[in-house]
Amino acid sequence: MSSVDVLLTVGKLDASLALLTTQDHHVIEFPTVLLPENVKAGSIIKMQVSQNLEEEKKQRNHFKSIQAKILEKYGTHKPESPVLKIVNVTQTSCVLAWDPLKLGSAKLKSLILYRKGIRSMVIPNPFKVTTTKISGLSVDTPYEFQLKLITTSGTLWSEKVILRTHKMTDMSGITVCLGPLDPLKEISDLQISQCLSHIGARPLQRHVAIDTTHFVCNDLDNEESNEELIRAKHNNIPIVRPEWVRACEVEKRIVGVRGFYLDADQSILKNYTFPPVNEEELSYSKENEPVAEVADENKMPEDTTDVEQVASPNDNESNPSEAKEQGEKSGHETAPVSPVEDPLHASTALENETTIETVNPSVRSLKSEPVGTPNIEENKADSSAEAVVEEPNEAVAESSPNEEATGQKSEDTDTHSNEQADNGFVQTEEVAENNITTESAGENNEPADDAAMEFGRPEAEIETPEVNESIEDANEPAEDSNEPVEDSNKPVKDSNKPVEDSNKPVEDSNKPVEDSNKPVEDANEPVEDTSEPVEDAGEPVQETNEFTTDIASPRHQEEDIELEAEPKDATESVAVEPSNEDVKPEEKGSEAEDDINNVSKEAASGESTTHQKTEASASLESSAVTEEQETTEAEVNTDDVLSTKEAKKNTGNSNSNKKKNKKNKKKGKKK
C-alpha cells in the first residue's frame, strides 16, 4: 500500500469551504469540516493520501452478491400462465378450478374468466379463491372457458377448456351432502348411498363444498346449530328429502326438487319409498359365482358315466374278462344310484320317470334295468328277463303322453342300446357259462353277473317299438278329429246353392218388360195419322198442329206409363214367389221355365188389350184435338185485341189486318 505526503497552506477559510495552496501555487478547495481544529488562514497543513486494497476487495464482493440476488429474483422466476381444470359438470352448471397463481416478481392486476370468447366475470381474490361455480347453463350444450391473467410483466392466457352439460338422464354430476336424518322414518345412510350408486352419482359427502348440488336431510330440530345446513342455505343449495334420490332412481332421470322440499306436500313421498337394504343383497352377486362352479362340477361325473356306458360294449367283444372287471367297477359305482332291487317295482319306477323330463338318460337306463339276485342259472335268468320286459312294456302302455318328450331325449340312448342288444345275444351264453363257473366264488362275483346283465340288454329292442306305436296311436285321433271339420263345411256350400237359383227367375222376369214396350210404340202410330188431314188445311194451321202435338205428347206418355206398370206388376209377383219357397234345386229349374211361359202368355194377352186401348186412345185424341183448336181460336181473339191497339197507331195497316182476321175466322169456322 503506497502513500503520498503533501504540505498545504490555508489561504482562505470559510464556514464550509477552505482554499488551500500548494507549493507549486495550485489552489485546492477542501471542506473545512475535515480540517483540524484551531486552523486559521496562513496555517500549514500536512496531508497523507494512501490506497486501501483490502477494503476494495470487500466492497467488490459485496456488490457482486447484490447483483446475483437481483438476477435471481427478477430474471429466473417469470410469471406462469394459469392452469384451468373441470371439477364437476351437471345439467345447468359447472365447477371450474385452477392451480395457485405464480407471478414471480410481477404484480397481479386482474384475473378474468372468458366464456366462448366473451368476458364472463372477474374473479375476486384470485390468490385465496381457486374455484368458481358457473350456473344458468343450457342442458346438453357445449361450452368453452378460458382464464386471462393480467400482471405487471404482461398478459397471460390459460388453455381453453371445452365441456358439455349433461342430459336429463345423465346423473353422474349429482353430488349429495348428507345432513341429519330422522331415525323414526327408517331411512339409513346405506339406502341413500346404494341409490346414488345405482344412478351413477358421485359418492356421498359429509361436508358442503362448492361442487355440492343437493343437501339431503329430513330432520330440522337443530337447524341453528347445524353448520353444514347453514352453509348450504348460504350457497343456495337445494335442501331436499331423501326420497328425491329414490325418485331419480325410479324415474331414471333427474327429477325436479319442487315436490321434495322439507315444507312441501308429503303425498308424493309415498310413491318413492326406499327398499330395505340387507347385507345378503350386497353379497348376492358374489354368491352366485361359486354356486355356478359347484353345479358344473356336479355335472362332470354324469357326463363321464355316459361315456363309459357307450364305450363298454365294444370292449366286451374283444376281452370278456376285462368286461367282468369293468362290470364289477360299474356295479359298485351304480349301486347307490339305483334305488330299486326287485323287478316288480321297476314298472312303478318307470311311471315316475315319465313325469320328470329332466332325468339323465344314464340314470333312466339304470333304473329301468332290475338288479338280479346272485347265482342265477340260465333258465331263471331268461325267465326273469322276460318278466321284466313285459312289466316295463305295460308301464309304457299306461304312461301319459308326456313320454313323447322323454322319448325324444332317449333317442341317443336307444341307439347305444341297439348296439348293445346286438352284442348282448352273443354275450348271454358266455355270461351264463361264466355264472356257472363263478358260483363257488361267492358274493364277490355278484356285481360281475349284474354288470353282464346290464351290458347285454335285450330290453331295449322291445321297449322302443312300443313307444313308437304309442306315439303313432296318439297321432291317429288327431287325424280323425280333422274329418268332422271338413264335413261341417259341406252344408255351408249347399246353403249357397238356393241363393244362386233364386236369382235366376229375377233375370227372366226382365224379358216380358222388354216385350211390353212394343205395344207402346204401336200406340204412337195413330197420333201420326191424325196429323195428316191437318197438314192439308193450310200453312197457319200447320203451326198450331205442331204445337198441339207437342202438348199431347205428355198425355200419351202418362197412358204409356200406366200400360207399362201393369205387366211389370205381374212379372214382379212371378219373380218374388219362387224365392220365398223352399224348393229343391232340380225342381226350381222346371218351375222357372213354367213361369217364363206364363209370363209370355200374359204378355200376348196384354198385346191384345193394348190394341183395344189404342183405339180408345185414338178417339180420345181426336176429341182432344178439337179442344185444342178451340183454344187456338181464343188465342186468335187475343191477337185481334192487340191488333186493334196497333191500328190506332198505324191507321194505314188496320184495314189489311182486319181482312186477314176475317179470313182466319172463316177458316176456323169451317174447321
Curated annotation (Swiss-Prot):
InterPro entries with a match to the protein in the record:
BRCT_dom, BRCT_dom_sf, Chs5_N, CHS_Export/Cell_Fusion_Reg, Fn3_2, FN3_dom, FN3_sf, Ig-like_fold
- Topology in membrane: Peripheral membrane protein
List-wise, which residues carry Phosphothreonine?
305
**Entry's Pfam families?**
BRCT, CHS5_N, fn3_2
**Where, per the database record, does this protein carry Phosphoserine?**
338, 362, 365, 383-384, 573, 579, 590
User: Which residues lie in Basic and acidic residues bias regions?
Assistant: 322-332, 409-419, 487-521, 581-591
Q: How does it assemble?
A: Component of the CHS5/6 complex composed of the 4 CHAPS proteins BCH1, BCH2, BUD7, and CHS6 as well as at least CHS5 and GTP-bound ARF1. The complex interacts with the cargo protein CHS3.
Q: What is this protein called?
A: Chitin biosynthesis protein CHS5
Origin organism of this chain? Answer: Saccharomyces cerevisiae (strain ATCC 204508 / S288c) (Baker's yeast)
Q: What is the lineage of its organism?
A: Eukaryota, Fungi, Dikarya, Ascomycota, Saccharomycotina
